[in-house]
Swiss-Prot record:
Protein's organism: Saccharomyces cerevisiae (strain ATCC 204508 / S288c) (Baker's yeast)
Name this polypeptide is given: Calcipressin-like protein
Biological processes per GO annotation: calcium-mediated signaling
InterPro entries: Calcipressin, Rcn1_fungi
More about this protein: Present with 521 molecules/cell in log phase SD medium.
Phosphoserine modified-residue sites: 113, 117
Length: 211
């Protein structure tokens, strides 16, 4: 007659101290590799690892019989040869609230699967939007606004106006633009804007040879 499958597995050992921290950690790593990464175990129904130090044993309460059976199958691996795995006589999950199955003083851990990548609710049918080609950074927008506000060149220059206006002015000097008529080749005179760079202020230390 085969073993009755329950959701609770008892781990013992006659070769080592099963409740030693190193062995507990070794079992945790083994469960993570063989169970938690293969099954989606969430915090609502975690895999419970209960350490009974006084009784020198560990209880594994699985979310389902299917998972407990996979734990038993995986326990036959060579890395678990120092540990003994066996089913409990009754389901621990269903009977934890009953007084006669109350777990004695123990350490309890709740193990869950790592987050899936991508998550289970990810919609693979959605396509990523194309990059926005017309969005400017706030720096570009600020520079554009300053350029428009400065009005370096009039929108509709007066063709009969041969005056001068300032292109750039600072404490050091100024750059001015003079409008002057030019011949367009057909005998018609047109205004053309050109930049006239002013000479820097002359120093008292300059000599005539520097001109």
């Amino acid at each position: 007659m085969g073993n009755i499958i329950t959701d609770t597995i008892i781990i013992t050992s006659d070769k080592c101290d099963i409740v030693d921290n190193d062995n507990v950690e070794r079992i945790q790593v083994w469960l993570s590799k063989n169970i938690l990464r293969k099954f989606q175990i969430n915090e609502n129904e975690p895999l419970q690892l209960i350490i009974l130090k006084r009784f020198k044993r560990i209880l594994l309460i699985c979310p389902s019989h299917d998972i407990s059976q996979h734990v038993m199958d995986a326990s036959r691996a060579l890395e678990m040869e120092n540990f003994n795995f066996s089913y409990s006589l009754q389901d621990g999950q269903r009977n934890l609230t009953k007084q006669y199955l109350k777990v004695p003083e123990s350490e309890k851990m709740f193990l869950i699967s790592p987050p899936a990548s991508p998550p289970p609710e990810f919609d693979f049918s959605k396509c990523e939007d194309a990059p926005q080609r017309h969005i400017q950074s706030h720096i570009q927008q600020d520079q554009q606004q300053r350029l428009e506000a400065s009005q370096l060149l009039p929108n509709n220059p007066d063709k009969n106006n041969n005056g001068t206006f300032t292109l750039l002015k600072s404490k050091v000097g100024a750059i001015t633009i003079d409008r002057c008529p030019t011949n367009d080749g057909n005998g018609q005179m047109q205004l053309a804007d050109h930049v006239k760079t002013a000479f820097p202020p002359k120093s008292i230390f300059d000599t005539d040879d520097d001109d």
